[in-house]
Amino acid sequence: IKVAMLGGAERQALGLADFLIKNYNCKVHLVTTHSNHPTKEFFEFAMACGIKDIHYFGEPSLTVRKEFSLLNLKRTIRALKYIKKMKREVAKFHPDIIIPFLNTPSKIAALIYKSVGAQVTFWHQLGLDNYTYDALENKAINNVPFVIANAQNGLEVFQNYYKTPKEKLFVLPQYVSIKKIVLDAASLKDKFGVPNDSIVIGMIAHYRTEKFQELLLQSFSEIKTGKNIHLVFLGNKDNNEETIDKYNSIVALSKSLNCYDRVSFLSGESVEEVLNCLDVGVLVSEIEGTPNVVMEYMLYGLPVIASHHAGCIGLLQPSEFLIPNDKNILRDKLQDLIDNENLRIKEGEDNADKIKKFSIENYIDSLYSIINSSS
């Protein structure tokens, strides 16, 4: 994995490790490529999933351009040293398979897997992520046996830029990485400053620029209703400067929109606790793969309003609540669900039924089939 912070990709990785350890008696070694400092939330979740150690072998330097220059020569030397170190350290685990999450771990896995004795790896594309378009990335993508994306749009770079053969490209949405836990909603609402008699709208998402909390705030502030309504945001504001700035900006925006007293801005709280408080789940964003949080909303039987990204469509269709990122449309969809309890119930029941096929058992079966078809 990339960082020891409990986002969607990391939950998927740890949940998969937990399942493989408990059901197949696998020995799983976890390597982070960009972080030697796990968050408390990540560390506790990793230990609960049977991970004994979190390994880190230094910051990767893996960008090598197709050019002749002193700078590029230095980059090449650094990259070769890093790859050599990764081969040496990962070989100690005697891996049979390397399962990467996100692009940089995929790049590393593709470059080292044969040398460390692994039988297979793959490129694992999971939504918004960076590409370097350099010589090493090109080599890694050519080397990798196959590519898995969690939504169709995740394959576009491989199809259009790298011209990867279509028989090497697969779409495999992730599984639901949490179990539904029913908790005392009244006490949790009190904990989070949510009036107990309110209809609660929530958006669980990183405090990052590609997540559109501002859009939801603007739409929420324009809703006209005699009912008590409350908005909840959950992310982790303390990850870095970007997340702190984003958090502070939406707090300031809520004050300028005169809705600050009807919004709870949460950071680092339990996802399951917040899900138990919600009546409506929202995810509006610039880009997504197959978003974990939409799957979690569905697991908890919530109506969901989501940007009409390919991954959201794959989860929710057919649905009238797949929308463009438009303030007025979002406001009107929120209004419909606030005004109509029966509609909320029906949408929630439909979503709970749709999500049943996204189990970890089905995910493992599909992954096994892909590996076998590519061997």
Regions found by a protein language model. Give the residues of each.
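A conserved mid-protein helix/loop that constitutes part of the nucleotide-sugar donor-binding site
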Residues: 10-18, 199, 208-222, 245
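N-terminal strand-loop element at the rim of the active site
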Residues: 1-7, 19, 23-73
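A short helix/loop element that forms part of the nucleotide-sugar donor recognition site in Leloir-type
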Residues: 181-194, 249-250, 343, 366
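Nucleotide-activated donor-binding/catalytic signature segment of Leloir-type glycosyltransferases, i.e.
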Residues: 53, 244-268
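Short His-centered aromatic/hydrophobic patch
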Residues: 79-82, 100-106
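Conserved acidic donor-binding segment of nucleotide-sugar-dependent glycosyltransferases
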Residues: 318-328, 336-342
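Aromatic "clamp/platform" in nucleotide-sugar-dependent glycosyltransferases that forms part
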Residues: 286
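Short hydrophobic beta-strand element within catalytic cores of glycosyltransferases
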Residues: 303-306
